[in-house]
Amino acid sequence: MDSKVSNGSSLQDERITNLLVFGFLQSCPHASFHKELEVLGHELPVHTSGSDELQTDGNRCSYFMEDAAETDSESQEAVIRDIARHLARIGDRMEYGIRPGLVDSLAAQFRNQSLSEEDRRQGLAAVLQQLVHSYPADMGQEKTLLVLTMLLARKVAEHSPALLRDVFHTTVNFINQNLLTYLRNLVQSEMD
């Protein structure tokens, strides 16, 4: 675990969150937004290897190091996909507690083009605060918030598939601002 102090999420953190939310949404086999999700998948930044990086001695990175880095990255991506599938199954069980009126209201906020990204995050946070208290505390508040955040994204995308891109990015930003430490620890504990 990297212990350096940071005031925000790094590209690596954003990549992890993108993979997690994308994997969560992919785990919904009967969703009406699969076409939009496929398009979004092509727009997401992909991990690039350091195959053309020069080393301090002026030589190119060796294949052994490149293969190890790619293997680590692939391993991490597999872990994140597994976590996403697991959280999606939990979300399936939690779905009962989300009233359609909350989803309608949240979808209306995402359709409102005059709202800023911050306004959308605040709207998402307000809905989450309404929901989080209606679930048992045995799962832990951070895990409950993470699942509910992604579940709300899925519900809004099912309600209005055209909103998928906006709700995806707001969800990623919300997680990076509010649940990043929990997410880092979750991924790290699964990697160990």
Curated annotation (Swiss-Prot):
One Pfam family name is: BID
Q: How does it assemble?
A: Forms heterodimers either with the pro-apoptotic protein BAX or the anti-apoptotic protein BCL2. Interacts with PLEKHN1.
- Positions carrying Phosphoserine are S75
**Role of this protein:** Induces caspases and apoptosis. Counters the protective effect of BCL2.
Q: Which GO terms describe its cellular component?
A: cytosol; mitochondrial outer membrane; mitochondrion
Q: What's noted about domains in the record? A: Intact BH3 motif is required by BIK, BID, BAK, BAD and BAX for their pro-apoptotic activity and for their interaction with anti-apoptotic members of the Bcl-2 family.
Where in the cell is the protein located? Cytoplasm; Mitochondrion membrane; Mitochondrion outer membrane
- At the top level, the lineage of the source is Eukaryota
- The protein here is known as BH3-interacting domain death agonist
Q: N-acetylmethionine (modified residue): where?
A: M1
Looking at the UniProt record, the site noted as Cleavage sits at D57, G58, D72, S73, E95, Y96
